[in-house]
Regions:
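Metal-dependent catalytic core segments for phosphate chemistry
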Residues: 1-3, 13
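PLD/PLD-like phosphodiesterase catalytic module centered on the HKD motif
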Residues: 5-10, 18-177
């Protein structure tokens, strides 16, 4: 049983805050950096409600500078400045504002062509990573991974309800092509 009082701190597949979630996320980012350094296509896609954790943001900036393409779909608080030369040129941030607040968190790591998907409850905020019980699980079913690909691709292609974050921290409506 996973609760705030649980003694178990290691899990086989489950990434759990405050125990393993932060460290594993940072390992996954570092792995994408290694793939980029080896000349492989490297990409991270994150769909979440908030990203404000300093260590996570610094890791994503390092990844961007190493050649990793990063697409973020962030519903709420976002402390990343995308598109800043020499800092975050490969990071794109969009927000999709619809009728309903979305609660799904989806992570995707290209992993040298063997894409990995994760779903869970955690936003990338220090309170979620360090002071709450949150869980993220790898998606091991191929069909479920394909469905997540479809969902994220649709969200990244949305031109009706999406806004893009610019380097000057302003949001602009995505232009309909």
């Amino acid at each position: 049983v996973l609760t705030g009082l649980s003694r178990q701190q290691t899990f086989r597949r489950l990434l759990v805050a405050p125990h393993s979630l932060r460290s594993r996320f940072l390992e996954l980012v570092d792995r994408e950096i290694a793939h980029a350094a080896a000349g492989h296509h490297a990409r991270i896609v994150l769909k979440l409600n908030a990203i404000v954790d300093v260590a996570v943001i610094e890791a994503l900036y390092r990844a961007s500078n190493a050649g990793v393409d990063i697409d973020l779909i962030v519903r709420g608080a976002c402390s990343i400045q995308p598109g800043v030369p020499g800092v975050s040129e490969r990071i794109r941030v969009r927000s999709i504002i619809g009728e309903f607040l979305e609660h799904s968190r989806i992570w995707s790591f290209e992993n040298g062509g063997s894409r990995e998907w994760y779903i869970g409850s955690a936003d990338l905020m220090d309170r979620n990573l360090d002071r709450r019980v949150e869980a993220v699980v790898p998606v091991e079913d191929h069909d479920a991974g394909e469905r997540l690909t479809e969902i994220v691709d649709l969200m990244l292609a949305d031109e009706r309800r999406s806004w893009q974050l610019r380097p000057d921290a302003t949001w602009v409506r995505t232009e309909v092509v």
